[in-house]
A protein has these predicted regions:
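Residue(s) in the substrate-gating loop at a strand-loop-helix junction
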Residues: 137
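Substrate-binding pocket helix/loop in short-chain dehydrogenase/reductase
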Residues: 92-94, 98-106, 210
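The beta1-alpha1 cofactor-binding region of Rossmann-like NAD(H)/NADP(H)-dependent oxidoreductases
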Residues: 56-66, 99
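Short, small/polar-rich loop/turn modules that mediate ligand/substrate recognition or access, typified
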Residues: 169, 174, 240-242
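Canonical Rossmann dinucleotide-binding motif of NAD(H)/NADP(H)-dependent dehydrogenases/reductases
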Residues: 2-32
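Short C-terminal tail/terminal secondary-structure segment
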Residues: 88-91, 142, 230, 241-260
Length: 260
């Protein structure tokens, strides 16, 4: 990977996306992020003045189109795409999932990835080399009780990834999915609180259940995910394609608190 690369990271102003963006920026790459949250964008740009940004809701096609108009105006090219935008969705049994929450989760986690990829792929193809990393989840590798919108969207991400890898391989573009386990931070805290409420347990009890899923008995760090993404976009990782790579401390199995 050379410093001439232009990299787009969706939901790049906070969390995993910010870690990824700052890792690429450290090498002197050109980084453009998009995010729905203007406050997060301003904070990111204040700390990373060499980066550029667009305020974008990836679930809205017209906003994604505007995002790529920005990229074309600023850089005129794109080498690497990191599809990171996603939300956790509702925590409830499938019969209690609000239809609008299902639609919102699929809209951001899957439709948004499709919209962004649709615009990005022609730009990357022109270079006859490049990388795409789609952020899925260990929830895309197994079922997860009370998380049907999220799990369904993340399974779909892996299917999209494998298909893109087949289509783009002849252009020397590798495409992979990175599947984080529970990542320490605000999102898992919100999920834990929702599960605790639904199950009549304390947040500490639910947190312990989640941590017991992993052989390492801890949550992974956002930096762990960023390091894997960076490797897959480097020369050393370029022959890896079409894979769904878990970064999860080895998930041994699902939590069983629904049986309590």
């Amino acid at each position: 990977m050379t410093v001439a690369n232009v990299i787009l990271i969706t939901a790049g102003a906070s969390g995993i996306g910010r870690y990824i963006a700052e890792l690429f920026l450290e090498e002197g790459n050109a980084v453009h992020i998009c995010d729905i949250n203007a406050e997060y964008i301003n904070s990111f740009l204040k700390c990373n003045p060499k980066a550029t940004a667009s305020q974008t809701d990836v679930s809205k096609y017209d906003e994604v189109e505007k995002l790529f108009q920005d990229i074309d105006k600023i850089y005129g090219k794109l080498n690497i795409l990191i599809n990171n935008a996603g939300i956790a969705g509702a925590s409830a049994g499938i019969e209690d999932i609000p239809v609008d929450n299902w639609d919102k989760t699929i809209g951001i986690n899957l439709n948004g990835m499709f919209y962004v990829s649709k615009f990005a792929v022609p730009l990357i193809k022109v270079n006859k080399s490049g990388s795409v990393v789609n952020i899925s989840s260990t929830a895309g590798l197994m079922g997860v009780p009370n998380r049907s919108p999220y799990a369904a969207s993340k399974w779909a991400v892996i299917g999209l990834t494998k298909t893109m890898a087949m289509e783009l391989g002849p252009f020397d573009i590798n495409v992979n999915a990175v599947c984080p386990g529970c990542v320490d931070g605000d999102r898992i805290e919100r999920v834990i609180k929702a599960d605790a409420k639904n199950q009549g347990k304390t947040a500490k009890e639910i947190e312990a259940v989640y941590k017991r899923q992993s052989s390492m008995r801890r949550f992974v760090k956002a930096g762990d995910i960023a390091s894997m993404v960076h490797f897959l976009c480097s020369d050393r990782g370029h022959s890896i394609s079409g894979q769904a790579i878990a970064v999860d401390g080895n998930t041994e199995g699902l939590f069983n608190w629904l049986d309590d």
